[in-house]
Amino acid sequence: MCQNLVSQELPVLSTTSQFNREQRFNHQENGNYARDTHNERDQYVGLWEYNQNGILFLLKIEKMNRVINKIEAPGFETIYNYFDLLILRYRLVKDNIVVFDNLNENDVDPIANYATKLGSYSFASGRIWDRTRNVRGSHTITRLNTNPAKIIFNLERFDYTKVNDSSFYQDGQPLFSIPQNGIEMVKID
């Protein structure tokens, strides 16, 4: 069982920097805390909007520090580590109908909707859960050097996990309800 628990405290046994590419293989070590030592996450924080072709997609990105990833299995030693993450929430409206909205919810599931910014990579990457279609997909978020501030949110086409039985997805609908293929989003807050 893999969990992310914000409130549970276990001792930090070592610390690595998410900015230091040489330490990237040490981030997952038991008891490690992978910290955002260079404030790389700041550039992504805010409310971002995509509004085209009858689709309004709002993406709220917030920082969450020291999120625990804990793995427990009967008969094995508990393994855990901490990460500084970006947490994603979203509202999806299609043809003026709200399809999904958790923008203002307080419950946070960091394992479902998150991103990390590692090293000198020009993007943050992680997973997002399309709650309408019940599919978890990998994504990248690239900050553009523009005014107004913009990002490219790219929900990957080929890296996903279907949560429902495969028969659920044979309804002639696209696999994801969230827009895909590198959409440009503008910062509105």
Identify the role of each PLM range.
Residues M1-V45, E49-G54, R66-F83, I152-D189:
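Amphipathic/hydrophobic helical signal segments and adjacent flexible N-terminal regions
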Residues L59-T146, D189:
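Central antiparallel beta-sheet cores of small beta-barrel/beta-sandwich binding domains
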